[in-house]
Design a protein with these regions (language model features):
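Active-site loop-to-helix "anion-binding N-cap" substructures in soluble metabolic enzymes
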Residues: 1-170
Length: 170
């Protein structure tokens, strides 16, 4: 049977109480839907509350970002080791907003991807073109190059823990 992945991120929304309420509303809607993985990637401050609310359901809680270093002077960042110590299994890397607003590059996406995989996490890798590239008709070339650069050095074995999400920057 084909297995589907339904993943979403909450961006900078939901307090812990709102996250709990949202998950409690969703849980009855997905009962018995065993052919899909449902993943909500949450802001760091809501992860614990979301995990607690998701207990006993098929909902998995992930993070919206991860840094490539294990530790250090990276104010505001969180390492893969920190996330896994909190029971976080999934992480989004390369989201269009991270690329657009925070200047994430294919190089930093690659470093983050390898760090998350090394920590045993599952990566939701976002790929996609900017509007100008879409209008120029080079989407396929751009996404192909991103795939090559973002996954450089990632083994075939590690690819079992990578989910590719098409997420354009427009």
């Amino acid at each position: 049977m084909k297995r589907y992945v339904i993943a979403g991120n909450w961006k900078m929304n939901f307090t812990p109480a709102e996250a709990t309420s949202f998950i409690n509303e969703i849980k009855p809607m997905i009962e018995g839907k065993n052919n899909c993985d449902i993943i909500f990637c949450a802001p760091y401050v809501t992860i614990a509350a979301a995990q607690e609310a998701a207990k006993g359901s098929q909902i998995k809680i992930g993070a919206e970002n991860v840094h490539f270093a294990d530790k250090g002077a990276y104010t505001g960042e969180v390492s893969a080791k920190m996330l896994t110590s909190c029971g976080v299994e999934y992480v989004i890397i390369g989201h269009s907003e991270r690329r657009q607003y925070f200047g994430e590059t294919d190089e930093t996406v690659n470093l983050r991807t390898k760090a998350a995989l090394a920590a045993g996490m599952k990566v939701i890798l976002c790929l996609g073109e900017v509007k100008e590239q879409r209008l120029a008709g080079i989407t396929k070339e751009v996404v192909s190059m991103q795939t090559k650069l973002d996954l450089a050095g990632v083994s075939a074995e590690d690819m079992k823990n990578v989910i590719i999400a098409y997420e354009p920057v427009w």
